[in-house]
UniProtKB/Swiss-Prot annotation:
Subunit organization: Homodimer.
Reaction equations catalysed: (S)-dihydroorotate + fumarate = orotate + succinate
Name of this protein: Putative dihydroorotate dehydrogenase A (fumarate)
Compartments, as annotated in UniProt: Cytoplasm
Protein family: Belongs to the dihydroorotate dehydrogenase family. Type 1 subfamily.
Biological function: Catalyzes the conversion of dihydroorotate to orotate with fumarate as the electron acceptor.
Taxonomic path: Bacteria, Pseudomonadati, Aquificota, Aquificia, Aquificales
Signal peptide start-end: none
Length: 306
């Protein structure tokens, strides 16, 4: 049985990754289990300089999920390379750096700082960030701005570039198209949905920033729908990485059958640290029960079965 997938010229031992912002940089999780069993680790977001994040409270539970407004807290790319990277560089799995910035220049600088870090095999762009030079509009909410960002980064880097698309748009396929046209190597669907929770006793929003990103089981059907739509239009042109609402192997298989070549387990890591391993095991058992020898047979199969 073959669970491996080759994406953007890189072979992954299995299609189960962990999502950015839910796994730190892999150091803490490595004390709980052997993270080399994972297909890949996507790091917590990295910016050029250290960020302290938003005021608290910045996490609140909701039915079937959670809202977060962490504010992209991170040590900055140089401190990451100096203090954290040495602890992960010998782990036998791939690491993908989640990267963000407030300007095109910052995105480019962060990626360039990581070009010589061999353990980092690709970049995942978080484009749900405000462009301070364009009046604060999110990079991922304007197709022209997004296309320019992808084009500018691709011109400078050698490693594959994945773009994590926002679901908070009218037509996600429009944004997928501009990423493809400007050289993106992969698409990650989806980022969190904007939401709010109000404390009726305090008469105000629970989060200090009022709104936050909704993740967890509640967003599974939305992620599956968007993956299906993008695969339907562009599945033969670019690989899709599915993320959003994956708690079990069954959830992961919905992503895969909709068109994802690999999946990321996110929020589930907070309450079940072994969730990614259980997803891997579940996919293996499913393939055995269905007499499927190669995982790749399942990618996008929902488009081929009537």
């Amino acid at each position: 049985m073959d669970l491996s997938v080759e994406l953007f010229g890189i072979r992954f031992k299995n299609p189960v990754w962990v999502a950015s912002g839910t796994f730190g940089y892999g150091v803490e999780a490595a004390e709980i289990y052997d993270i080399s069993k994972l297909g890949a680790v996507v790091t917590k977001g990295l910016s050029l300089k250290e960020r302290l994040g938003n005021e608290t409270p910045r996490i609140v539970e909701t039915p079937c999920g959670m809202l977060n407004s962490i504010g992209l807290q991170n040590p900055g790319v140089e401190k990451f390379l100096k203090e954290i990277y040495p602890k992960i560089k010998d782990v036998d799995t791939h690491f993908i750096a989640n990267v963000f910035g407030e300007t095109e220049e910052e995105y480019v600088e962060v990626c360039m700082a990581l070009e010589d870090a061999d353990k980092i095999v690709a970049y995942e762009l978080n484009v749900s960030c405000p462009n301070v030079k364009k009046g604060g509009i999110l990079f991922g909410h304007d197709p022209v701005i997004l296309g320019n960002l992808v084009d500018r980064i691709k011109a400078k880097i050698k490693k594959p570039l994945l773009v994590k698309l926002s679901p908070n748009v009218t037509d996600v396929t429009e944004f997928a198209k501009v990423c493809i046209e400007n050289g993106a190597d992969g698409l990650v669907l989806i980022n969190t949905l904007m939401g709010m929770k109000i404390n009726i006793w305090k008469r105000k929003p629970d989060l200090a920033t009022k709104t936050g990103g909704l993740s967890g089981p509640a967003i599974l059907p939305i992620a599956v729908r968007m993956i299906y739509q993008v695969y339907e239009k562009f599945g033969d042109r670019i690989p899709i990485i599915g993320v959003g609402g994956i708690t079990t192997w069954e959830d992961a298989m919905e992503h895969v059958m909709a068109g994802a070549s690999a999946v990321q387990v996110g929020t589930a890591n907070f309450y079940e640290p072994l969730a990614p391993l259980k997803v891997i095991e579940g996919i293996e058992n499913f393939m055995k029960s269905q007499n499927i020898k190669d995982f790749k047979e399942l990618i996008g199969i929902a488009h081929r079965v009537e």
